[in-house]
Amino acid sequence: MENRWQVMIVWQVDRMRIKTWKSLVKHHMYVSKKANRWFYRHHYESPHPKISSEVHIPLGEARLVIKTYWGLHTGEREWHLGQGVSIEWRKRRYSTQVDPGLADQLIHMYYFDCFSESAIRKAILGDIVSPRCEYQAGHNKVGSLQYLALTALIAPKQIKPPLPSVRKLTEDRWNKPQQTRGHRGSHTMNGH
């Protein structure tokens, strides 16, 4: 039988970021109990030697599986020391990979209190609204003016330690796009 390759997206991450992620997940699973339905699988429980941990997050009938890897081929930079993260959405026999932003939104939908757009309607109707959003990483857009006014009125409470964000885990701190100068600031265009 011929070899079959399966390609998957693995986000290159430095090991300190993975260590922080694991620590936050364990804290919110066992101490704060905000993620008590999550399941953490250690590296010695995994049959694959490159997997350093797995976090299974139930989302209704589906689940999100976040795997951290070690011992991968290093990247083009010296700090890419063979660490990585893959994010997978599974439901029964179907699975697909998702990006960190979508993963955070899915986590937000099923867990953590939110002062969301529906709070405006509830406040107008006289219902009690949740005063804050516990998981800011799950929002990827700017709210309406009414929403921004209500959030300015009710100051968000900072949670220590912060909730684990998949987007923050996979964020590239070193390769942020360079800010290019405008027409006035460009030395080559001005002939200097």
From Swiss-Prot:
Residues 54-72 are annotated as: Interaction with host APOBEC3F and APOBEC3G. Keywords: AIDS, Host cell membrane, Host cytoplasm, Host membrane, Host-virus interaction, Membrane, Metal-binding, Phosphoprotein, RNA-binding, Ubl conjugation, Ubl conjugation pathway, Virion, Zinc. The record marks 150-151 as: Cleavage in virion (by viral protease). Processed in virion by the viral protease. This is Virion infectivity factor. It comes from Human immunodeficiency virus type 1 group M subtype D (isolate ELI) (HIV-1). Residues 14-17, 74-79 are annotated as: Interaction with host APOBEC3F. Residues 151-164 are annotated as: Multimerization. Pfam families: Vif. The lineage of its organism: Viruses, Riboviria, Pararnavirae, Artverviricota, Revtraviricetes. Residues 151-180 are annotated as: SOCS box-like.
